[in-house]
Amino acid sequence: MTPAQCQARLDAGHVTFVFAPPVSEGKCAIPLPVRLRSLAIGADEIQFTGEPTLDCRLAERLADWIGNVVEPLARHHLGSGLAAIETGPGYVCRNRNNEVAGKLSEHAKGNALDIAAFALRDGRRVAVRPADQLAPAEATFLAAARATACGYFLTVLGPGSDAAHAEHLHVDLGLHGRTTNYRICE
């Protein structure tokens, strides 16, 4: 993808962003990184509080999922639209689960994002936590958002997947297996 193609796709998705310098740190690299700032939905804007640095393709997919699925789910289940998505930085040069050895994390390619919470327009904040730690409507909203993420991303991990993902929702576009045709949705 060229910078012009990235610009056109994110502009079409009503994404406010800036191009970041290409990343190259040893095995870690993002040839076309962007920093996400916000997503416009009609007259409203949803802020990305961490301004994560991501590969353009992930930024496009994320904006599509949030705008077309997560925002309507929040209105339906919680009675309020989204004001912000609280995220991690996106890009981090590290191995999976911060292990000393092992496979490179999708974060190291700008191909993954961790979502810690959803801030609502009415001032509430829905943190990603196990369902038994949430109000029923919040648990239903997070379960629906997580289930729909499995149709947009190739890996979706969150509370109950493992200890490393107990307090955030991890989404990425990492390819899996020899044929690269399956998803991990836990």
Model-derived segments and spans:
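Catalytic cores and adjacent binding grooves of peptidoglycan-active enzymes
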Residues: R37, E71, L104-E186
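Active-site-adjacent substructure of cysteine-protease-like catalytic cores
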Residues: H76-G110
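Short, solvent-exposed polar/charged micro-motifs at secondary-structure junctions
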Residues: C28-L32, C93-N98, H168-H170
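Active-site acidic/histidine clusters and adjacent loop/turn architecture
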Residues: T2-E86
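Short intrinsically disordered, low-complexity coil segments enriched in acidic
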Residues: M1-A4, T180-Y182
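Conserved aromatic-histidine-acidic binding/catalytic patches
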Residues: L54, L58, K103, A137
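Beta-hairpin (beta-strand-turn-beta-strand) motif
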Residues: I41, G88-G90, F118
